[in-house]
Every structure is written in structure tokens, then in C-alpha cells.
Amino acid sequence: MAQKEEAAEAAAPASQNGDDLENLEDPEKLKELIDLPPFEIVTGVRLPVNFFKFQFRNVEYSSGRNKTFLCYVVEVQSKGGQAQATQGYLEDEHAGAHAEEAFFNTILPAFDPALKYNVTWYVSSSPCAACADRILKTLSKTKNLRLLILVSRLFMWEEPEVQAALKKLKEAGCKLRIMKPQDFEYIWQNFVEQEEGESKAFEPWEDIQENFLYYEEKLADILK
């Protein structure tokens, strides 16, 4: 299953880039690691089509999908009822902070207590235990923040630590959902680059509904 393959990737110290750090005695492998560009968080408004089709696909076996893509919508509402909305996406590159943590470091590094924040994430996979802990800490000290997380896949969902982290998110008021086919279509329309002069319709992959139901059942079992 997907969680087993992702678990193997996450076991390495540089978990997000999938490199096998146990082979550092290999000169070629060492050179490859040294030549990696420095860690950075990629941000933008719309992500390339091929990134969406590969990274967001809700497959059960997620080999090779060792990055996190996070599309976000932030609605900020004043006491007078006026609201402003911004949106974009984050992609984590190589080792370092994951996209969830980077969101709070770069997109919303501070919160105005006089405003209300409604944040929606569309994420390629559910948070790891460490990212869930960061989310919990932010929610606990930011009472004017409401967070909805929609995920394509569940990351390492059989691990007790991850299950406990997801339960704590629910208990803290964070809403966690598996993406429905309609959610993928929403991402396609609002966060994916379109060819200039034309807007192609979203084409669901063959097992999109089946895999949604699979992950929805797993998440319900975890959160019950």
C-alpha cells in the first residue's frame, strides 16, 4: 500500500527527497547529494499540469511522490464583515520544512487578533506527525483561525503515531477530509496552469472515485 512505500522514503534523514543516505560511501552517490541545490520552498499561483496529474493523483501506491504540494485559499474577514481572499500553492523541495510548516512561516507568519481567518488547504497527502504537531500549536494559540484540510492521499496511515496526530487535529477543531472528484476538479480550475487562449475540462482518471472511497473509509476508521 502507499503508506508502506512512503514510510520507507520517510525513514531516511532527508525524508522528502527520497535519497538513500545509507550509501554515502559511494563517491558517485555522495557527489549527487552534494550537487543538490539548497532547500527552498517553491511558491506560485498555478502549478504545471504534469505536476498536478502526478502529485495529486489519489493512488494507493504512491511511489515517487516524495514531495508535498499544498494549494491554499485564505479568507480574511474584518469585524465589519469585509473579506479579502488570496490563493496560491506551495511545493517543498529537497530536505527541510514541509509545505504545511512553510505555509505558516511564509504565507501566514502572523495573525491579527482583530481579524478572522478561514483557511482551506488542498494537499497532495495528509500531514506527517511533525507537521500535525505544528498545526496543533498554531491552532491552540490562534483562536481566530479556522482550518479545513482536504487531502488526496493518507500518508503512512497505518502508523500509530500518525493516527494519533490526525485524531488530535480533529479534537483541536481542524476539519480533515479526503478529496472527492469534485475537489480535484476545483484544483484543476483554480490552481493549475491552463493553455493560453483555452480552458481544458478536467478529465478524471479511471479509479478516482474508487480511491476516494478507499481513503475515506480509512480516515473514518482513524477518526472515529
UniProtKB/Swiss-Prot annotation:
The keyword Thylakoid does not apply. CDD domains: cytidine_deaminase. The active site is at E100. Coiled coil: none annotated. Residues 1-23 are annotated as: Disordered. Probable C to U editing enzyme whose physiological substrate is not yet known. Does not display detectable apoB mRNA editing. Has a low intrinsic cytidine deaminase activity. May play a role in the epigenetic regulation of gene expression through the process of active DNA demethylation. PANTHER family: C-U-EDITING ENZYME APOBEC-2 (PTHR13857:SF4), MRNA EDITING ENZYME (PTHR13857). Belongs to the cytidine and deoxycytidylate deaminase family. This is C->U-editing enzyme APOBEC-2. It comes from Mus musculus.
